[in-house]
């Protein structure tokens, strides 16, 4: 079963999409967190929700401000608003499924926001089973690459329009907010990192460095996979690894150290 709905919290308006198994009660809950310029309706989150639903998982996905169906404009795209959007949706999902394991599948920028919010997130929902697909550990640097400017040029223009699934602006203030949190640090949470061997956007070296400073992190490099995991067989491997982690917090493939 699939349906759309909206959540509200103070100034936030959050479009959401929920998938529940067609037969039987859900066994686990997944919060799906999209990447920068994406939405709750991206192919990755849709495929994940549909495939995991076969195994009894419910999935809740949402749009960040200025993404997807969000009525919030580009000025609402701040790091604080993204964190609060994540926490609000997580709280709703946890209240709906209070007795189920709480799992998170987050990609790119969504993984970055999840790491920013992780300590508060665990206060809201308790223990989290976390899968990060191609996490963007240097989001501020990535944003400079997307606007094709150095920091001084961006400061001078203050605002740049990006063409993604939806056209929106990014501001220099948003860039400065991203500078305040470097995700390449240590965390007290078991997690699985999935990264494409031939990712053309995010450096694999960051993933190895993250793994080395986080003892509870498992890293799997998907052979021949690009940033979008479009290589034949790559997405099937992502699904299998994600299911293994969410059900048993282990992976059958060996970890890369």
Regions found by a protein language model. Give the residues of each.
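Gly/Ala-rich beta-loop-alpha elbow adjacent to hydrolase catalytic centers
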Residues: 106-114
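N-terminal cap/lid segment of alpha/beta-hydrolase-fold proteins
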Residues: 1-24
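The alpha/beta-hydrolase serine catalytic core
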Residues: 112, 124-213, 217-221, 226-257
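The serine-hydrolase catalytic nucleophile loop
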Residues: 37-49, 205
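Catalytic nucleophile-loop/oxyanion-hole region of alpha/beta-hydrolase
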Residues: 41, 67-99
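Conserved alpha/beta-hydrolase
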Residues: 45, 49-71
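Active-site glycine-rich loops that stabilize anionic/oxyanionic intermediates
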Residues: 34-39, 197
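Short beta-strand element of the alpha/beta-hydrolase
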Residues: 26-35
């Amino acid at each position: 079963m699939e349906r759309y709905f909206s959540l509200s919290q103070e100034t936030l308006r959050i479009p959401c999409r929920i998938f529940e198994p067609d037969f039987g009660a859900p066994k686990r809950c997944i919060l799906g967190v999209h990447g920068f310029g994406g939405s709750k309706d991206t192919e990755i989150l849709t495929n994940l929700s549909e495939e995991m639903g076969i195994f009894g998982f419910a999935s809740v996905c949402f749009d960040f401000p200025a993404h997807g169906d969000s009525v919030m404009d580009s000025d609402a795209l701040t790091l604080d608003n993204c964190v609060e959007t994540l926490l609000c949706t997580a709280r709703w999902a946890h209240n709906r499924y209070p007795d189920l394991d709480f799992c998170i599948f987050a990609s790119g920028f969504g993984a970055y926001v999840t790491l920013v919010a992780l300590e508060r997130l665990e206060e809201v929902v308790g223990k989290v089973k976390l899968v990060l697909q191609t996490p963007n550990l240097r989001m501020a640097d990535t944003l400079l690459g997307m606007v094709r400017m150095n920091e001084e040029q961006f400061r001078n223009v203050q605002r740049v329009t990006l063409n993604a699934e939806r056209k929106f602006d990014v501001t220099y203030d948003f860039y400065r907010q991203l500078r305040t949190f470097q995700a390449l640090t240590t965390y007290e949470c078991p997690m699985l990192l999935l990264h494409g061997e031939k990712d053309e956007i995010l450096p694999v070296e960051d993933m190895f460095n993250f793994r080395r400073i986080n003892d509870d992190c498992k890293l799997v490099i998907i052979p021949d996979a690009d940033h979008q995991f479009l290589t034949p067989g790559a997405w099937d491997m992502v699904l299998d690894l994600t299911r293994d982690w969410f059900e048993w917090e282990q992976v059958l493939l060996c970890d890369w150290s």
